[in-house]
Amino acid sequence: IYHPGYVAKRLEIGAVVGAVPAKNVRREEPVPGDIIILLGGRTGRDGCGGATGSSKSHKLSSLEHCGAEVQKGNAPEERKLQRLFRNSEVTKLIKRCNDFGAGGVSVAIGELADGLHIDLNKVPKKYEGLDGTELAISESQERMAVVVAKEDAEKFLELAKTENLEATAVAEVTDTNRLTMEWNGKKIVDISREFLNSNGAEKHTLVTVTNPQPIVKSVKGKTNGEKFLNLADDLNICSKRGLSERFDS
């Protein structure tokens, strides 16, 4: 989008469309003893606060103060994940999976089963010095979490190596109906699934909804043909084919 409001925080949109034969996809409920494997990029402080940071108003000075909120993408690592998931031998091992977004380990792994025990010390780090909270909420990109049966875990780890992907067993499905996280031998999170599913205490607020004003844009040109060409010449409307062919190619 070409707009003065995006000078400091530019907007780029990219997408990948994938397809897998239905016979190669499992959709199963995790059972106690299943293993959660984290694969892809390592975890760092980049991404801590990313979900809220992306909604802030930014200016030129934001680069200095908010640079760590959203990580610069690592396209080659993403490509390796895509290549791995094209392998039917891999997808047939996966009971359930999640990508990492807002909330990091807490959400991406925390959503996979009702009862979970996560060992944060096993989460691969980009550098030392991260505490348990940072490991739990970091939104570092290029990461996936998959649930596999205990007997399939070693095979999955070996298959990940074929794409030069780092994969680590970091959590186990339990029958406790609680989400627990351990760091340096201490249990730092112990929350019941019943509470998590409640979304917390009820919140109420008063809002005033105003009707949006219609956008009236005058188009230069005497004839419809001239107006059409002038519209097509607008950077926000013209073909983006050139960009799409260069992006992550």
Language-model features, listed with the residues they occupy:
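Glycine/proline-enriched, intrinsically flexible loops and inter-domain linkers
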Residues: I1-S249
